[in-house]
Amino acid sequence: MRSNENRAISIVQKDIEGNIFECTEGLSFWGGVDPKTGCIIDIHHPDHGTCLSDKFVLMPTSRGSCSGSGVLLQLAQNGLAPAAIIFNEMEEILTLGAIVADQLFKKKVAILRVPRDLYSALAMADKAEICENRLMFGSKTIKLRKLNIDTVNLNSKDKSILDGNHGAAQQIAMETICKMAVIQNANELIDVTKGHIDGCILAHDANLIFAEKMHQLGARISIQTTINAISVNRDNWQRQGVKPDFGNKASRLADAYVKMGAQPTYTCAPYLLENIPKEQEVIGWSESNAVIYANSILGAKTQKHPDYF
């Protein structure tokens, strides 16, 4: 049996301390946490009303919408994020949000994945601290293993991107992809031929800030990529009584992706467009219904990716 120290992984590192709060059930941050307050607003969740800000939040894994990554980024931007989120199962949505917050904006939310026995011991404690890659609570001190992206075998082009030879945006994207690969226990990457971007609605300013930051850094889309539905009728919102501040921000969000090379499709149903994926074609789609349709009806292959991925 491996020791807890070998199995406790620090995915996003931050020296921080705080009170421990155990979520009795998994939580969807999208629709479940208010990014303006940090409180749980899902009335069906047993911890409804609890504020997660500055706490060491324990939950087995998250659940629900892949847009939860954006909510965590907005919480980090607002200074209302949990101090740390600790999982004992595979988790990608909030993890990706924390990676993006760190990589692009230097807003850290500590993310750990620990074995279940250590998780249970943490749940019995009142406070915890992370310092110099060690987790401390009660009388215990656990050494945390850093995420090691060197375990991912890259081809020469991907290595060059990771080394920063193709610009900052590409380097950040490749490092993020490699981190997510390690989280999934993957040891190599597979090229995809098509993409579909979610996170295009102006649910909060984080979606806009992310897209414009990537464009500012020089990001360019390199495969056929479509865009999900947006928050306004791009051409007619001014005539529909939409408030100018909201309409302008929603338009800027859509325009940022188009400027990076995405097709202005603005649909949740990319499978109804021309040049749809073929059977066995490996693609990278977001938007839950599109992922289900692609895998089950078209026979293509895609994961359900979190927003920003």
Model-derived segments and their meaning:
Residues 2-26, 138-217, 303:
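N-terminal basic/disordered segments at the start of proteins
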Residues 2-136, 231:
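Feature captures the catalytic cores and cofactor-binding loops of soluble hydro-lyases/lyases
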Residues 15-16, 49-53, 78-81, 214-218, ...:
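Flexible, charged surface loops at secondary-structure boundaries
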Residues 30-38, 56-63, 166-176, 210-219, ...:
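Phosphate-binding glycine-rich loops and adjacent basic patches that engage nucleotide phosphates
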Residues 99-114, 127, 136, 227-308:
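A generic, well-ordered mixed alpha/beta core segment in the N-terminal half of proteins
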Residues 144-151, 182-188, 220-230, 279-289:
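Short, compositionally biased low-complexity segments
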